[in-house]
Amino acid sequence: YMHLGLTSSDVLDTTLAIQLKESARLIIKELVSFRDAVKEQAFLHKNLPTIGRSHGIHAEPLTFGLKLAVWYEETCRNLERLKRAKDRVAYGQISGAVGTFSNVDPSIEEYVCKKLGLKPAPVSTQIVQRDRHAEFFTTLAIVAGSIDKFATEIRHLQRTEVLEAEEFFSRGQKG
């Protein structure tokens, strides 16, 4: 009787929405922490001169703080994107095999979604429309691309022939 009147997607899509919403909450928390750390370092190094590069070739001087300020702003934009994507993916449905509520009252969908911290999909078929998921995962790809870019830059700056940044080594640390 637990499944009576429902389609599997009513359960699975609604569950996926909860998982993605919670995942976004955790990622946002970590991104806020990262953003704040980058901001702190940007101010700390706002007057530290470094060489600006164009296609890896020395171009003009800039400050390390400016480089970090660029990362800060990009992270702020990524946070905005992820918050929007979190809101757009947080939709559930309990509307039956083809979304017509033929075997379940629409008030059930509203009640369940509210209890789960979701919004009812305004219109659906058997599934919550996948553009919501596509937007969410595209946003994650943008965030991951930024993090990859930051990590690659740090790795480049630590190269022996560049050595403009260095990992802190504690006594006895290897590697």
Predicted regions and their residues:
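A helix-coil-helix interface module used to build multimeric assemblies
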Residues: 1-95, 101, 105-111, 120, ...
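Generic secretory/membrane-interface signal
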Residues: 4-7, 113, 123, 147, ...
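Intrinsically disordered or highly flexible coil/loop and linker segments, enriched in small
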Residues: 40, 44-47, 88, 121-122, ...
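Glycine-rich anion/phosphate-binding loop at the beta-strand->alpha-helix junction
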Residues: 78, 82, 126-175
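A short, charged helix-loop
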Residues: 111-127
